[in-house]
């Protein structure tokens, strides 16, 4: 059994410095030298102590002050994460690929005491320097400091610990406030995933590594800095998705968190007999979106242990986990965790209650009240149904519903899943066009007729009220927000 901890202090002083001190914590591939660097937990913890010393020495009265990380995945990112928290600061994760309009809004909202950046230009370097030059800091500032001898206990269990921004598709992003209690309540679910892998392999001493290509401002990657230290396992951190095949061979990885586009790429390798390209990978953890059940079933029947996690930034990524590998249930998001409460509203909206629910949206009590009711239920905005075996299946997003004059409700995600099965379709968005259900399709110009024919055939299988009667084409990728989600407006 893996021991579940409930605070950052113990994670570093017990797990990193004692239980797993001789195990590898993090690996990085350096394209320039073609070398892999492996860092053991004891050395990782020593650098975390340096970071604590650095922040406490250079930011007076740091308790509660906002410190932003604005950079790509790196070892320094991981070290500063724990250093900021243990020193008493509030860690703010920012997406370096956002526009200056979005970044300046988020920076202005949190009013940071410091912004750590790697110095690379992601398109906003000049504006960042002009507006915040006096508080910009390099990522490796901690290296010049001696490790703090006595690790401080600065964090209240229910204090604000981390600020992460949602990736809204219809308006400004919101700052999600997460506490230590929020974060560590989720560790039970992540430890359970580890134990299920042990059961699957019939090996209670199983030690694995996870490859992460997702950016650290993405909760699915970031939370692994905490969860994998529970089992003394390693994170293999990608520097560039373009080096995927080389990195996953040079840094043997059994587990990988995936979004649909990555899962589809892995699926092609498996189905075309190129599984060896994936090295030791056997556990894709699917999160952040709805996945094609057939793709997951294909992976499961070809030796992969497919895990799905359902959650939101507002639930600290917690929610429901699905371990089912059978055709009937692999398309579900799971049966629910025993430490959370669930209910379906009359309109089908899924609601969740428990310790992982956020403190609220930063400086936005009105928006908080819209999603967390007086009884503590978080309204996910996702529509779902529950089958006779207790499995929850997502059916769409409440705010995306198209409501026809006839009163019928249309889930665009359902129709997008149908259109997306056409091989010529690269991306698509279903929306209301006047009084019609329409679809915007990104595909090659010479494939447009193929797509029209596919939609015509698909419509014949649908009820009249669900049929797509307007089709528009784009020869360019469809617009997305800073987190890569398709915009629907």
Residue ranges: model-predicted function:
Residues 1-58, 63, 82:
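N-lobe entry segment of adenylate-forming
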Residues 21-24, 147-165, 171-172, 198-209:
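Conserved pre-ATP/AMP-binding loop-to-beta segment of ANL
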Residues 38-42, 161-188:
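Conserved AMP-binding A3 loop
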Residues 39, 52-98, 212-213:
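Conserved AMP-binding/adenylate-forming
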Residues 45-53, 157, 176-202:
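Conserved structural elements of the adenylate-forming
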Residues 115, 344, 354, 359-360, ...:
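AMP-binding/adenylate-forming catalytic core of the ANL superfamily
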Residues 184-209, 216-257, 261-273, 280:
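Conserved AMP-binding/adenylation subdomain of ANL enzymes
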Residues 254-258, 266-328, 341:
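Gly/Ser/Thr-rich phosphate-binding loop
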